[in-house]
């Protein structure tokens, strides 16, 4: 497997810059996930690595070789698309073996590669079926099989699970992760779903507006977000933000309520406190912040509360069954180690 280096990579369409000097090192055998909202440039970046989109500036290096001008077929890369891109008139076997056949490989070699891919993906029972006879998950596995027989140095996945239902997405992300562990391949995976990113990645690259916001292991991003955007994007349910002021070791809301924060956050300044739903705890009467309940969602082991603190929407998840009604006021707090403070203007951590 090969390393992939992006050195000052940019992409422009006329006067519009969609990727702005991206620097990124993807290690050999790494499962790297590019995640971000729609329009952040992650799929464009993947297509540039694949050779499907010209590079406006910077250098793409694959396995130590500059690849900016290399045609896609010379990059030894395989790409799995969101839309499967299967030939409807070919069986699963023929779809998987299509690449080796058009490259002129011997029939016996092609058959062996197809058999190997089918074994990895548990597809033997479906090889003689046409795409219309397969489920969404089976079609995606056929598309993955077509990538495997290419024996690439790098696998590229462009939102491959977006067309699947929720249950099948969970199953397929497990299968893709298991495939990576078996092949020890270099994988660059694009998704807008941060749950996919958190559960599959060795490292995550969070992107927004054509720029990298943070790179790191999933739990590093979760525990130590580089800015308010990353804090709000990583995590499901997402972090709640409450505006106020930090002074003398306390965070104070505009309504005068306060909670203790880390000593490092001393000094009066406008700020926003970010608290993850699972870090809220019920406080003693008259302490903490007042949560005004709007919607209650009991899930069995947990109770999800939607409401407002100081007029701002928040979501709290309690690991117990709590009997509440809309309109009730509940005192809540969080440990200082779980309160993320961000500068009101820059969004950077305090």
From Swiss-Prot:
Residues 4-234 form the ABC transporter domain. Pfam families: ABC_tran, TOBE_2. SUPFAM superfamilies: MOP-like (SSF50331), P-loop containing nucleoside triphosphate hydrolases (SSF52540). CDD domains: ABC_MalK_N. It is found in: Cell inner membrane. The keyword DNA-binding does not apply. The keyword Transport applies. Its EC number is 7.-.-.-. It is an enzyme of class 7 (translocase). ATP binds at residues 36-43. Disulfide bonds: none annotated. It comes from the Bacteria. GO terms for cellular component: ATP-binding cassette (ABC) transporter complex, substrate-binding subunit-containing. PANTHER family: BLL2173 PROTEIN, MALTODEXTRIN IMPORT ATP-BINDING PROTEIN MSMX. The complex is composed of two ATP-binding proteins (BAB2_0493), two transmembrane proteins (BAB2_0490) and a solute-binding protein (BAB2_0491). This is Putative ATP-binding protein BAB2_0493.
């Amino acid at each position: 497997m090969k390393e992939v280096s992006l050195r000052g990579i940019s992409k422009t369409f006329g006067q519009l810059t969609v990727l702005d000097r991206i620097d990124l090192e993807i290690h050999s055998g790494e499962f790297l996930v590019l995640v971000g909202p729609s329009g952040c440039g992650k799929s464009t970046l993947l297509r540039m690595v694949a050779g499907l989109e010209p590079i406006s500036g910077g250098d793409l290096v694959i396995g130590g070789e500059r690849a900016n001008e290399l045609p896609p077929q010379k990059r030894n890369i395989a790409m799995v698309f969101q839309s499967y891109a299967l030939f409807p008139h070919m069986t699963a076997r023929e779809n998987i073996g299509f690449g080796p056949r058009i490259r002129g490989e011997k029939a016996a070699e092609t058959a062996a590669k197809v058999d190997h891919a089918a074994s990895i993906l548990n597809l033997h029972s479906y090889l003689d079926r046409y795409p219309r006879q397969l489920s969404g998950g089976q079609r995606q596995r056929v598309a993955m099989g077509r990538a495997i027989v290419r024996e690439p140095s790098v696998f590229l996945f462009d939102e491959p699970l977006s067309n699947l239902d929720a249950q099948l997405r969970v199953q397929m992300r497990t299968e893709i992760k298991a495939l990576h562990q078996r092949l020890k391949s270099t994988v660059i995976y694009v998704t807008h779903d941060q749950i996919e990113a958190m559960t599959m990645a060795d490292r995550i690259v969070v992107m927004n507006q054509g720029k990298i916001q943070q790179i790191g292991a999933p739990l590093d991003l979760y525990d130590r977000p580089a800015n308010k955007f990353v804090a709000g994007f990583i995590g499901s349910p997402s972090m709640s933000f409450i505006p106020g002021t930090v002074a003398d070791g306390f965070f104070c809301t505009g309504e005068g309520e306060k909670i203790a924060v880390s000593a490092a956050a001393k000094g009066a300044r406008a700020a926003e406190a970010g608290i993850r739903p699972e870090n809220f705890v019920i406080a003693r009467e008259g302490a903490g912040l007042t949560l005004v309940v709007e919607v209650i969602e009991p899930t069995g082991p947990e109770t999800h509360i939607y409401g407002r603190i100081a007029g701002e929407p928040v979501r709290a998840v309690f690991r117990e069954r709590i009997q509440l009604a809309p309109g009730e006021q509940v005192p809540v707090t969080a440990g200082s180690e779980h309160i993320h403070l961000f500068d009101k203007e820059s969004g950077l951590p305090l």
